[in-house]
Amino acid sequence: MLNIQNYSASPHPGIVAERPQTPSASEHVETAVVPSTTEHRGTDIISLSQAATKIHQAQQTLQSTPPISEENNDERTLARQQLTSSLNALAKSGVSLSAEQNENLRSAFSAPTSALFSASPMAQPRTTISDAEIWDMVSQNISAIGDSYLGVYENVVAVYTDFYQAFSDILSKMGGWLLPGKDGNTVKLDVTSLKNDLNSLVNKYNQINSNTVLFPAQSGSGVKVATEAEARQWLSELNLPNSCLKSYGSGYVVTVDLTPLQKMVQDIDGLGAPGKDSKLEMDNAKYQAWQSGFKAQEENMKTTLQTLTQKYSNANSLYDNLVKVLSSTISSSLETAKSFLQG
């Protein structure tokens, strides 16, 4: 670049002005290097290819077995985090979009915002927005949907599945706790063992820890909490009673509904005192009346799990549909970039 300060006009007519002075070693002359269009397209291809790979991995986790363990949830969370990182790279590189692609992404990632429960407002597109800003908006929103919506449901279903499995383990012992009475008109039920196991399960899920909290989703050490407003919002979304909203530390959490178990224990107490052998003998009519109430509470627990599983499935489908829109857009952009280099 021409440095005008290195030229000096001659004070005498007819004398040629001095030539530019050579910069000293201590001086630095900056030269802007503008990457060629080919180099830019090559960078786009790398970024788009990486994003396409991460999208495929995310789709595989969405199609796998529903999350019922911490390991499954961790795998899904990692896939979502890697997808978000690859989208951030697209935003930084400014991969260009066609007008149709721009509108498709704006439409897809703006529509679901009102249905989500995000701790922070999701990015909203302006009337005029650059391609880089579109990618940034998509990255922010898919991260919020994954962590604050789908991620919550994954945790809810995992915790509730473990809870119901523990209850099912108690049911599996019922055959050994039920014996015939003195004649064909009575039965003997080991109410002490049944009550003890039910109380143990109630006490376990009355404790607030990473294995018992439905919302917020837990990870790492300690217990994460939310504001009361956020917790109440999810309490309503999960259709759980107020007893599931609990204050903990500086915030609030939503826990498993223990009402059915507590009603079971109450009904057992209503049967009367057991004998010295911990069993209670009753006529068939009394037993059948108790059994009917017990099964009704069991059905309530089963219905709650089925409802939460369906809500999780809906959240999974919403996220999957957004990922499909992304996959189509990125595949199209990748083909365009490759065609430019080949053409």
Swiss-Prot record:
Induction: Transcriptionally regulated by SicA and InvF. Also regulated by InvE.
Gene: sipD
Cellular-component GO terms for this entry: extracellular region
Top-rank lineage group of the source organism: Bacteria
NCBIfam families: PRK15330.1, SipD_IpaD_SspD
The keyword Secreted belongs to this UniProt entry's keyword annotation: yes
Listed name of the protein: Cell invasion protein SipD
Sequence similarity: Belongs to the invasin protein D family.
First-listed, main subcellular location of the protein, grouped into a coarse class: secreted
Coiled coil: 295-322
Compartment(s) where it occurs, according to its Swiss-Prot or TrEMBL record: Secreted
UniProt entry tagged with the keyword Cell membrane: no
Organism: Salmonella typhimurium (strain LT2 / SGSC1412 / ATCC 700720)
Function (record text): Required for translocation of effector proteins via the type III secretion system SPI-1, which is essential for an efficient bacterial internalization. Probably acts by modulating the secretion of SipA, SipB, and SipC.
Region (Disordered): 1-26
Domain comment quoted from the record: The N-terminal domain is an intra-molecular chaperone that prevents premature oligomerization of the residues on the coiled-coil region that are involved in interactions with the needle and/or itself. The residues in the C-terminal domain probably form oligomeric structures at the tip of the needle that are responsible for the regulation of secretion of other effectors.
